[in-house]
Amino acid sequence: LRELMQARVPQMVEQLGEFVNLESPSLDVAHLQHTAKYLADLFADVTGKKAEVIPGANGPHVHWKGSDDTKVLIVGHHDTVFPLGTTSTRPFSVEGDIARGPGIFDMKAGIVQAIHGLSAISDSSQVEMLITADEEVGSYTSRELIESRARATGAVLVLEPSADGGALKIARKG
């Protein structure tokens, strides 16, 4: 599996660059529609399975299921805190082993890696992934969907980046 994923790094970096340069500020529904479509297409290209784009008042969410009998939910978000136009001064870039750009850390890189990870495991039938459009503004329109899918699966992995020093986040603050 390690060799397979290592071989995919150039493809993942290219896809990450496309995703980062598609700006997705919270509450900018038009731009969030573009990133939702990009993610749905990426799911299809990488996994061979179709993802559903679910309309939301604050922007569309993207939902992919390995089957109708999933046990694990992976949650992420495609909205960012960066205002429209940020990529004109801070576009995606790679220097050595470091990629930079708006939204890369929270959480566009994790989403690209997770999609590739799902396609690389021999059986992803018990996994589903939900990428929401409003996490940075409180998840008000996605909360019910997240809670419903979490109850249905029973186990949830959130793609939130590590805390300072690489510590694993195990709870939501507040």
Task: Label every PLM stretch briefly.
Residues 1-104:
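Acidic/His- and Gly-rich active-site-bordering loop/insert found
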Residues 107-174:
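Acidic/histidine-rich catalytic neighborhood of metal-dependent amide-processing enzymes
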